[in-house]
Structure formats: C-alpha cells, structure tokens
C-alpha cells in the first residue's frame, strides 16, 4: 500500500522539486539569510533577437507557462508512461 501511495505522490513531488530547483537556479528564489526572497524579474544579457523595446526591469521568469510546464507537464509524462505500461500488463508480458 505504501508503494502505491508513493507512485501516486511521486509525480507531484518531482514537479515541486523541479520547480524549486529551476527557480533557484535562474535566481528567482534567493536562499540568503535564512529568508526566502522572490525576485521575479531577470535581465538576461542575450534575451532578445531585437534589443529595442525590452522591458526596463527585465523579463518575468516565473509565469503561467513556467507553472504549466513544471506543475502539469511532469505529471502528464508520468501519466502517459503509466498508460503505456498498462498495455504490457494487459497483454501478459508482465505478471501483475
């Protein structure tokens, strides 16, 4: 029963850790002085093909797209992998 619960919770945990890791790597989460700082805008040096009309404070890093990719994309891959694995279990390649 513990294994089944872990299999269900694993995609959520991986998505959460992945989101925290990448936002820390990009400099959005600042882990200084034991306080969680949040700086959503980064001024990328090579961020645009056309350098004119860039925002003054940089571009937002954490957007709805970031949330969708990290929080929805990773569990979707696990879900599709589970459906793929079920095809083999159903045909008797693996004994369930």
UniProtKB/Swiss-Prot annotation:
It comes from Prochlorococcus marinus (strain SARG / CCMP1375 / SS120). The lineage of its organism: Bacteria, Bacillati, Cyanobacteriota, Cyanophyceae, Synechococcales. The keyword Transmembrane applies. One of its GO terms (cellular component) is photosystem II reaction center. One of its GO terms (molecular function) is heme binding. This is PsbF-like protein. GO terms for biological process: photosynthetic electron transport chain. SUPFAM superfamilies: Cytochrome b559 subunits. The keyword Transmembrane helix applies. Belongs to the PsbE/PsbF family. Unknown. Resembles PsbF, one of the subunits of the photosystem II reaction center. However, it encodes asparagine rather than histidine at the site PsbF uses to bind heme. Pfam families: Cytochrom_B559 (PF00283). InterPro entries: PSII_cyt_b559_bsu, PSII_cyt_b559_N.
């Amino acid at each position: 029963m513990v294994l089944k619960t872990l299999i269900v919770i694993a995609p959520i945990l991986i998505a959460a850790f992945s989101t925290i890791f990448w936002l820390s790597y990009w400099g959005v989460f600042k882990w200084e002085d034991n306080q969680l700082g949040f700086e959503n805008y980064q001024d990328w040096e090579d961020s645009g093909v056309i350098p004119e009309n860039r925002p003054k404070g940089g571009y937002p890093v954490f957007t709805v797209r970031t949330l969708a990719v990290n929080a929805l994309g990773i569990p979707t891959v696990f879900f599709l992998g589970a459906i793929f694995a079920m095809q083999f279990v159903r045909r008797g390649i693996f004994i369930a």
